[in-house]
Amino acid sequence: MLISMDPLETPHSCIELTKALGEKGVINFSQVEHIIMKYNRSVKEVFQLFDLIRILTTDHAILTRITREVIEDFASENVVYLELRTTPKRNDAIGMTKGSYFEAVLEGLRSVTSVDVNFIPHDKEDSRTLFSPNNGSSRKRIYVRLLLSIDRRETTEAAMETVKLALEMKQFGVVGIDLSGNPLVGDWNTYLPALKFARNQGLYVSLHCGEIPNPKEIHQMLDFKPERIGHAICFEKEHWEILKSSKIPVEICLTSNIRTLTVRSIQVHHFVGLYKTKHPVVLCTDDSGVFSTCLSKEYKIAADAFVFTGLGKRESFELSRNAVELIFAERQVKEDLTKYFDSVAKTMGVYKNKIHSYEL
């Protein structure tokens, strides 16, 4: 479930943070302002923006703020389960290690006050679940779980360091490993040892797959059989056959794919073919700030564009409910969410609650 944590809830919030670093001499603001404000960006421009985000998120205080704001934003639109993807980074100039980076994320989780957040695995808490009748809270509630991302620019050793950090932090809601970053760089065999180790140690694995034409790597990724893949755009016939036979769930990011021009138009998006054949899919935002979207908007885009597939209110609700089986959280969370969705289905004429995944 592609949700990336980034400082771009709006272009203005990114400009605010960038200006602050510009005043400190860390960034030349005039060189990046136009990239922030641009609406449609090419793949190359998107990764230029990600380079800026990388700088912004190598600051503990900013990272804590972003984490808090991302959770509050998704909770405000009735998201009840959120997987946050975040790439642990180093910044020797300020003493940031991958470990201290993660601690800043944790501080952001703990600092949320507007909503009840559950990020500790269920077996570490009492028997009450977040949506159980005896919970005793009338406030908005949200489950949050974390995926630590391996950046494609990293070495095998750096990738392994991220996996080991994920294992150390499982008690704080880390459920898996993600492979992401600029698809134009790196080689699959660089990350494979770390990904195999992660799987052998019980972590789930999600891969950004097929963002650009790379038939060999796509085949290698599908052969690895990750628990989920994101995008699946530049697939050839052979890749589609492998994907559909393996039933690997796909994270669909409509706005992201259109604005990076990797899909020609919404009408020809591969979501239709996957949905009609009942392949496991889930709608996601990718980087919601980068692409100026939110989960509600992604569902509306799908409903408006694919009405001919019969994707009405009930089907959209079922699409979100079915995503419960695709999340990386523990069994008790899945059971709690399923009961909650069933309760909503019985009591509300309009279905309002969603499942989602995001990145920092």
Describe each model-derived feature in a short phrase.
Residues 1-203, 211-217, 221-228, 233-360:
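Metal-cofactor-binding active-site regions of metalloenzymes
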